Structures are given as structure tokens and as C-alpha cells.
From Swiss-Prot:
With S4 and S12 plays an important role in translational accuracy. Located at the back of the 30S subunit body where it stabilizes the conformation of the head with respect to the body. It holds the Pfam family Ribosomal_S5. Signal peptide: none annotated. This is Small ribosomal subunit protein uS5. One of its GO terms (cellular component) is small ribosomal subunit. InterPro entries: Ribosomal_Su5_D2-typ_SF, Ribosomal_uS5, Ribosomal_uS5_bac-type, Ribosomal_uS5_C, Ribosomal_uS5_N, Ribosomal_uS5_N_CS, Ribsml_uS5_D2-typ_fold_subgr. Part of the 30S ribosomal subunit. Contacts proteins S4 and S8. HAMAP family: Ribosomal_uS5_B (MF_01307_B). Keywords: Ribonucleoprotein, Ribosomal protein, RNA-binding, rRNA-binding. One of its GO terms (biological process) is translation. PROSITE patterns: RIBOSOMAL_S5, S5_DSRBD. It comes from the Bacteria. Belongs to the universal ribosomal protein uS5 family.
Length: 167
């Protein structure tokens, strides 16, 4: 997949989780921070997730934002929702995403909501299954969004006209 030129996008950043981790050494405990960040351009339908690790929180956030900008994906949006139902899996985390009619809003838990809103999806139903770890939920949501295909893409892959899909 070609890398997206993020300099042309109006990216918004959201910190999803900050985790303090420790390494026990002879002299005591060394603390570091692991941060998960979601960046996205809701108007153009791009979203990315990144992780950063550092001794200080601001450094970890900066690294996570840089990582997220390197991993942007384009999300197919039909009107204000997604084209079809999909399940994204990452580790023990599963996220079920369902299209919803206009006016429903984003019905999703914290980490999943951050990804969907950053991608510009305004109407969607979701259910988190399995792991409730914020990082796993975010990556499972991204995996689900990567699997989405529009009717035009499916028709092109099958080599048939779009109207034939719905007959």
C-alpha cells in the first residue's frame, strides 16, 4: 500500500492511552511511558494509529504522532457511514462495526470512538468483543476499517457492473 502524503491533510490528534511501564533493575525500578495516538482527517477520510515509547510523556506522544502519520489509511465512507458490516481483529481484541442510518451517531466505546470519529465516520454501530485493552481495540478497529470495500471496488474485483451486485 502506498504511503499517504500527510502534509496535504488537516490532521487532528487524539491520545487514546498512556501506559506507565516499569523495568525492575538492581537499583530499583525504571519507569517509561507507552502512548497510543490516533491521527485523522475527518473531512477526507484518513486515519492512522501510532505508538510511542519514551522516558517522558511528551516525547512518547511526539513519537506516537510521527508513527501514526506513517501509517495512515483511507477509509471508504458511504454518505456518513461505512459500506458494510465488518469484524476487525487484533490480538485478543475484536471489534464489530455495523453501518447505521443517518442521525444515529457514533455508538462506540472510548478507543473505538476515537478512531471512527478521526476517520470522519458520523453514523456507525460498534461492539467490542474479547480484550478491552485500549491499544488492542484501536488496532482491531483499524484492521476492520482496512477490510472495508465499496460496491464499486467489489464489482471491479469480480469484473461485473455495479448494478449486477444487487440483483
Amino acid at each position: 500500500m502506498a504511503r499517504v502524503d500527510w502534509t496535504k491533510l488537516n490532521l487532528k490528534e487524539r491520545v487514546v492511552s498512556i501506559n506507565r511501564v516499569s523495568k525492575v533493575v538492581k537499583g530499583g525500578k525504571n519507569f517509561r511511558f507507552s502512548v497510543t495516538v490516533v491521527v485523522g482527517d475527518p473531512d477526507k477520510g484518513y486515519v492512522g494509529v501510532g505508538r510511542g515509547k519514551a522516558a517522558e510523556i511528551p516525547d512518547a506522544i511526539r513519537k506516537a504522532i510521527e508513527d501514526a502519520k506513517k501509517h495512515l489509511i483511507k477509509v471508504p465512507v458511504v454518505g456518513t457511514t461505512i459500506p458494510h458490516e465488518v469484524i476487525g481483529e487484533f490480538g485478543a481484541g475484536k471489534v464489530l462495526l455495523k453501518p447505521a442510518r443517518e442521525g444515529t451517531g457514533v455508538i462506540a466505546g472510548g478507543p473505538v470512538r476515537a478512531v471512527l470519529e478521526s476517520a470522519g465516520i458520523r453514523d456507525v454501530l460498534s461492539k467490542s468483543l474479547g480484550s478491552s485493552n485500549a491499544t488492542n481495540m484501536v488496532y482491531a478497529t483499524i484492521e476492520g476499517l482496512k477490510r472495508l470495500k465499496t460496491a464499486e471496488e467489489v464489482a471491479r474485483l469480480r469484473g461485473i457492473p455495479v448494478h449486477q451486485l444487487f440483483e
